[in-house]
Amino acid sequence: MTEHVEGTLSSGQYWQGWTGDVPVKGVVVLVHGVHEHGGRYAYVASRLVAAGYPVYAVDHPGHGRSPGTRGNIGSMAATVAGVDELARRAGSRHPGAPAFVYGHSLGGLIALQYITGTPIELRGAILSAPAVDVSAANPVQRAASGLLSRLTPNLGVLKLDPATISRDLDVVRDYRTDPLNYLGKLRARTGAEILNTVVAMQPRLEALKLPLLVFHGTADRLVPPAATEFVAEHVGSADLTVKLYDGYYHEAHNEPDRDGVLDDIVAWLDAHS
């Protein structure tokens, strides 16, 4: 049986968690992607909880049930701080349990920023389609996005198509009708924070020695699979597992064969807990 818990961080951000009645092998801090929220990972959480891994997720600033302009994360520093506070709270709820961070898309970038900084003691990290698109972080785009971020931070600059998240039409429909998702264009401030973080994080990858599982759908049109290849080539971890799912879209955990993906995640967690 899965128990749902929830609360707010010191920033006012909403967090939630899923726990179970099976022995705890480890605790997972889940970091969601842009324009969505932690509640979209209820099924992922149910699978991990059943395997002995309680899951905790925080809604980023401007996302889900957290305060802020919809779709505007404000600053990467504040977003990472929210992940850190939740990770510490989750750890205190399960003292002694190995801790893992699991980030998807923008959440993968946030997770990388966190784990290459000063995180809590971690046993490993899982990155799903991490938003590390180096080709987009060129000087011209960064300069333009920085100017827009300062002058018009809430301006919509890029439309993201929900049809590209999964081949499962029910998943796409649910995404479009979920009132907690933001369906507008990517905000200028959020875009600038993403590009700046991609650049700032790159030189820190070599020092990252944490065990990693990185996976990506080969048909992802939102974050190119080259992002996962870049991470795999530049991290310093000797314990690195990369999985590419042929023909899968952006959310491999929400594809028709999502249980196969989740089986792989559980197996990796079991091998590292």
Label every PLM stretch briefly.
Residues 35-38, 64-94, 261:
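Catalytic nucleophile-loop/oxyanion-hole region of alpha/beta-hydrolase
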Residues 45-68:
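Conserved alpha/beta-hydrolase
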Residues 94-104:
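Alpha/beta-hydrolase fold nucleophile elbow
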